[in-house]
Every structure is written in structure tokens, then in C-alpha cells.
């Protein structure tokens, strides 16, 4: 009977470890993306120039604000 108990504890520990690892990795990635967004102003400026638009600083600031706002909303909804 002791071997069954040991097997149950091992399986439970593995499941808890997987869940804990997933949650820690998810939190790390959320924090990393918040500190280092995947796109910055310079990349946005280059994209607009490639699309044939003349990027003004006001347009770039508006787009960055929209992207940051969208990212914040996504992070809040992911926490729920």
C-alpha cells in the first residue's frame, strides 16, 4: 500500500510543479513584455514610411498610446 501512496504523491507533485511553472513563466513573460514592448517608436516610424505614409510625431505618439492601452487591457483581462 505504501508504494501506491508514493506514486500518488509523485504524480501530485508533478502536476503541482507543472501548474506552478506555467504560472511563473506566464507572469515573467507578462512583465517582460510590459518592460520591453515588441514594437517601439522607431519601428513604427519605419513601418509607416514603408506603407507610404509620412509619419509625424503626433501620429506616432497616438499609435503608441493606442498600442499601450490595448496591451494594458489585454493584460487586465488575462489576469481575470
Swiss-Prot record:
Topology with respect to the bilayer: Single-pass membrane protein
Compartments annotated for it: namely:
Cell membrane
**Record key words, sorted:** Cell membrane, Membrane, Transmembrane, Transmembrane helix
- Specify whether Aminoacyl-tRNA synthetase is a keyword of the entry: no
Provide the transmembrane region boundaries: 4-24
A single GO cellular-component term from the record reads: plasma membrane
Database matches in Gene3D superfamilies? EF-hand (1.10.238.10)
* Tree of life domain: Bacteria
Keyword match Membrane: yes
Q: Which HAMAP family match?
A: UPF0154
* Family, as annotated: Belongs to the UPF0154 family.
Specify the protein name.
Answer: UPF0154 protein SaurJH1_1431
Name the species this protein comes from: Staphylococcus aureus (strain JH1)
Amino acid at each position: 500500500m505504501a508504494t501506491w501512496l508514493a506514486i500518488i504523491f509523485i504524480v501530485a507533485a508533478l502536476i503541482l510543479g507543472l501548474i506552478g511553472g506555467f504560472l511563473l513563466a506566464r507572469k515573467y513573460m507578462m512583465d517582460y513584455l510590459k518592460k520591453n514592448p515588441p514594437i517601439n517608436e522607431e519601428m513604427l516610424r519605419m513601418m509607416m514610411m514603408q506603407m507610404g505614409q509620412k509619419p509625424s510625431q503626433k501620429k506616432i505618439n497616438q499609435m503608441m498610446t493606442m498600442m499601450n492601452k490595448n496591451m494594458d487591457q489585454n493584460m487586465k483581462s488575462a489576469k481575470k
